[in-house]
Amino acid sequence: MTKTIAINAGSSSLKWQLYLMPEEKVLAKGLIERIGLKDSISTVKFDGRSEQQILDIENHIQAVKILLDDLIRFDIIKAYDEITGVGHRVVAGGEYFKESTVVEGDVLEKVEELSLLAPLHNPANAAGVRAFKELLPDITSVVVFDTSFHTSMPEKAYRYPLPTKYYTENKVRKYGAHGTSHQFVAGEAAKLLGRPLEDLKLITCHIGNGGSITAVKAGKSVDTSMGFTPLGGIMMGTRTGDIDPAIIPYLMQYTEDFNTPEDISRVLNRESGLLGVSANSSDMRDIEAAVAEGNHEASLAYEMYVDRIQKHIGQYLAVLNGADAIVFTAGVGENAESFRRDVISGISWFGCDVDDEKNVFGVTGDISTEAAKIRVLVIPTDEELVIARDVERLKK
């Protein structure tokens, strides 16, 4: 038995989960927030307890030190060296990383080079790797990429209709994201349906504040909604998803909001989506509450959100030539029952239908009616478990 920790490092946060492997038992999990700011918050959950402390954490190295010391303080481990492996979520692996990889040689430098593809994520992911490398230099460190699952896409799906030189010289293509989540729920869907994954055609919908939809055939991604960056695809909490690219030069010419690349990125990534249209919130719970109060902008935002998701599901039904199941996962997908009902009711012509009694808050499993030809499943994602499994597989 070994202890492996899965890490998801953000620019000012560090989410973690400690496993006993190969039993896949969660020993503890936690979140450190507001790294680099005053009044940082460290939360540790274990044995039904939740312990929280507020302190000033300057950087990721200090955050990791506090995490490890908390594990000892709460008697979850006796010493640092009980942890024999650490796995790090990394958003962008580009074309270079086609699978999870042990951190050695120039791997970390390559991760940082790929920050061009995920400027909001990869630098923070790399900071988490460096912090653990400094404090636990002898354990196996593994990087697990959101993009790896999508490297099976055919060229017709991942290429953009731009001049070829922008692909060959600049690597402009679709990379996708959330691959670890899509991979996990596809495997769980096969178990739930009692059929081999290799025999299934699935549409997996990872719908949280960020969202993506993937067409999965025989356990492999054949197309996905996110593109060159996690900005593409469906409408999201604060991101536009797909828009006409000509909008950008138009707004550069006629407004003061698009003067620099940073301005463009800020508006499209942080000020749009549900938040931008509703002028209210990026949180689906707030949107639904505002809809119930008759707020027009919130209602429009919700309708647009559902519409874009329905269109992508329909698109992937065409890509797959039908599907065995549509899978909902992540924060909104797992918990917003009215959202699931509304998405499926608009595409019921394809043979999918939701049973209202099964489609209740917090339910997992098959929520379809008996007569539905395409099953509708709700499966909680577990990206941390996939990361821990990959660490065990790659340990020296």
Swiss-Prot record:
Pfam families, per the entry: Acetate_kinase
Leading EC class: transferase
Protease keyword on record: no
DNA repair listed as a keyword: no
Gene it is expressed from: ackA
GO-annotated molecular function: acetate kinase activity; ATP binding; magnesium ion binding
Biological process per Gene Ontology, one example term: acetyl-CoA biosynthetic process
Organism for this UniProt entry: Streptococcus pneumoniae serotype 4 (strain ATCC BAA-334 / TIGR4)
Cofactor note: Mg(2+). Can also accept Mn(2+).
SUPFAM superfamilies, per database record: Actin-like ATPase domain
Cofactor(s) required for function per UniProt: Mg(2+); Mn(2+)
Name of this chain's protein: Acetate kinase
Subunit (UniProt): Homodimer.
